Amino acid sequence: MTKKTQVGLIFGGNSSEYEVSIVSCRNIYKAIDKEKFDVHPIWITNEGYFANEEESFKVLEDPSYQVKNPHKVHNISNLIELENLPEIDVFFPIVHGNLGEDGVLQGLFRLMNKPFVGDDVLAAAVTMDKEFTKILAQRVGVPVADWITIKRFEYDDKNNDKLDYEKVAEKLGRDMFVKPSNQGSSVGVSHVTNADEYAAALKEAFKYDDKVLVEETVPGTEVETAVLGNDKPIVAGVGQITNAKGSFYSYKNKYDDNSTSKLQIPADLPQEIIDTVRRNARKVYEVTECSGMARIDSMLTPGGKVVLTEVNALPGFTNISMYPKLFEEAGVPYTELITRLIEVGMERFDHKKTLLHKHD
């Protein structure tokens, strides 16, 4: 009998996307091939405590469950020696947002010398930062929305011109989006059209980050595609998101079962547009050095221009998430998708073991 691969499914975390992580983890646990994998859920509470496996299963059944015997991690050895933690063959992190998809957790796996699913340290960190993603996308000719960046010290200087809506509007137009540079799932994002909304949006965004992006609004339809793999990635088809008039693809619309946003897979678009979305996705995936997986989001303008909005290195796996739905449409069902994600993570690890880390 073939020995099953032991998978450590890490979820939760001290993140604004804590609840999304639990839903994604539950779906992955239900869908994973139990004949190939033994799954060990590892719950990180919102306070940053590690729970044992028994309690981790309980919170998957009831997200409101509170940990009874938390194990506070003070250093790496604490994590490695977590009580009742089996010998894990590969980690599958599904911790969304800060500390989960920004390279921090990935760096920990590297220190532990363990394979893991999803992007490596550099790609996770770069794609979490919306400004760096834009800069790299421009390098390979992928259009992005015009923007300015406001740092915390600039926000604290109340005389800074970047806080003046009218002056910013001269560059970006009066219709803008304000968003934390290092957040996902549209957390802290606001749509503004006047000075009062702009001031309130900056205040909200700086609750989540020390760097905030102010972008011109790109009119049109939101389109997304999904990418899987390492050196020779597979780009799925394209999905289209239709939002209710006057709304955008907000946190609520992304994860609420009563969302007013409608997902259309495959997108009903000309083949030329489909090809551009997929081609741009591959360029951005490669220039940001992604591996494993990513969801690439863009806006399609009425004039047919495809403008990159975001690279999500750890896309959602909820019931309404675009990433698994796009691959299902491409002929890769949920269970097979999870298997392939684990396989490409282990392949990357095996390759890195062949590299020299010291000079003889």
Swiss-Prot record:
Q: Which family does it belong to?
A: Belongs to the D-alanine--D-alanine ligase family.
Which InterPro entries does the UniProt record give? ATP-grasp (IPR011761), ATP_grasp_subdomain_1 (IPR013815), D-Ala_lig_Van_CS (IPR000291), D_ala_D_ala (IPR005905), Dala_Dala_lig_C (IPR011095), Dala_Dala_lig_N (IPR011127), PreATP-grasp_dom_sf (IPR016185)
Role description: Cell wall formation.
| Note describing how the cofactor binds | Binds 2 magnesium or manganese ions per subunit.
Major place of localization?
A: cytoplasm
Query: Where is the protein situated, by its record's location annotation?
Result: Cytoplasm
Q: Which organism is it from?
A: Lactobacillus helveticus (strain DPC 4571)
Which cofactors are required for activity?
A: Mg(2+); Mn(2+)
Q: Where does ATP bind?
A: 169-224
Task: State the pathway, as annotated in the record.
Answer: Cell wall biogenesis; peptidoglycan biosynthesis
Report what the protein is called.
Answer: D-alanine--D-alanine ligase
Keyword entries, A-Z = ATP-binding, Cell shape, Cell wall biogenesis/degradation, Cytoplasm, Ligase, Magnesium, Manganese, Metal-binding, Nucleotide-binding, Peptidoglycan synthesis
* Gene Ontology cellular-component terms listed: cytosol
Q: Which residues form the ATP-grasp domain?
A: 134-343
Residues reported to bind Mg(2+) 2: E310, N312
